[in-house]
């Protein structure tokens, strides 16, 4: 469904995480953030001219979720168990779908994704359990 706004809002974004064993259903994603990582190169030539470039070094970000299942913990458990069994680290793939204001859909693929559970949640009375996952991806490309 196209956005009813002249600008993007949070509900215009959908995320699909494909783990080493298939789709990871993160039930209630309440926030998502991604940042490009770069290595800055700065050069000052002898004539005083300053030049620069930014070399791509991957992407990082985070998911905020309201726990609706054990999916996030299961992904982390699978990664840990594989590591302790002497297995190779396995990567995930993340897809971000954005409903654009013109009615089109932009699809971004984050490749070679590694995930960590930075907040497993606080369990209190009748409160929801908020969790946070951080990720690193080698690349992000438009599909």
Labelled PLM ranges:
Residues 77-108:
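Short, acidic/charged, Gly/Pro-enriched secondary-structure junctions
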Residues 135-139:
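Short, structured patches in soluble enzyme cores that scaffold and shape functional sites
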Residues 2-75, 105-132, 142:
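Solvent-exposed edge beta-strands and adjacent loop segments
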């Amino acid at each position: 469904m196209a956005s009813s706004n002249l600008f993007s809002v949070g509900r215009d974004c959908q995320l699909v995480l494909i783990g080493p064993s298939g789709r990871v259903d993160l039930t209630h994603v309440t926030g998502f953030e991604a940042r490009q990582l770069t290595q800055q190169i700065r050069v000052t030539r002898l004539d005083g001219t300053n030049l620069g470039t930014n070399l791509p070094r991957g992407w990082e970000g985070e998911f905020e979720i309201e726990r609706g299942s054990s999916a996030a913990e299961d992904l982390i458990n699978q990664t840990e168990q594989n590591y302790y069994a002497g297995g190779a680290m396995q990567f995930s793939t993340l897809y971000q779908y954005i409903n654009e204001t013109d009615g089109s859909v932009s699809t971004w693929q984050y490749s070679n994704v590694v995930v960590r559970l930075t907040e497993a949640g606080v369990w209190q009375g009748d409160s929801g359990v908020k969790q946070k996952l951080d990720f690193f991806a080698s690349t992000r490309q438009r599909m």
